Amino acid sequence: PKSATFRTADVVGLDTMCYVANTAYEKCPDDPEKDVFKLPDYINKMVSNKWLGQKSGQGFYKKVDKGIIHSLNLKTLEYEPMNKKRHAAFTLAKEKTYLRDRLNAIVRSDDVAGEFLWKTFSRTLIYSANLAVIIADDVYSIDRAMKWGFGWELGPFEVLDAIGLNYFVDRCKKDGVAVPSWLLDLKSKQISSIYAYLDGKKYFYNLEAKDYTELLYHEKHIDFQIYKSKNNIIDKHWSASLVDLEDGVAAIE
């Protein structure tokens, strides 16, 4: 989401976040990542202080004056002026127009921001891949749930494709991270993406069939990538593309 991690927590409310985290920790005893739901001491302290976020006027952020917002120092629990830092990863991202290209670039940046983002994304994507066969019938249902329910622009497996499946698998192995067998199987088959556009249709990798299956859309749904895969781009510039949707209709993306 555009509000990112801590601002989203403020909007949702730390009391709600804590309830969800505690419930997940207690009700998912066999979850391999259940320990991420253990709340750090500073969050418990914030809740006891009634610093619940937007609903209480302060949380991770606090508006101290008109147009002036301070952020919480997690070590001292005092509000301080925000010190915005410049990172090479952000510079690389700003050079890219599309989110997929930005994601591909930032995880390859060797500065502290790039390393942080790689560790965050890789852990999230490995978790998603490990549980894909348990929590859903197919990968696109997980992607849709994250986009429709949590405001992600791309679902986890779309993010993995954006990063690059081969790069992702190779770097995880280099980092000593166990890679789910089905991702290794994809790489061994020289399949380089979970989603594919072929002959004007979109396909997803079916974990049960171990092959691509066509993704069927509602008749009113428009996927620009399908038309772009058919070379239906009339004109393209750095900020937008004019795409032929056929039937005498064009659209700007």
Question: What are the roles of these predicted feature ranges?
Answer:
Residues 1-253:
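N-terminal glycine-rich phosphate-binding loop for ADP-containing cofactors
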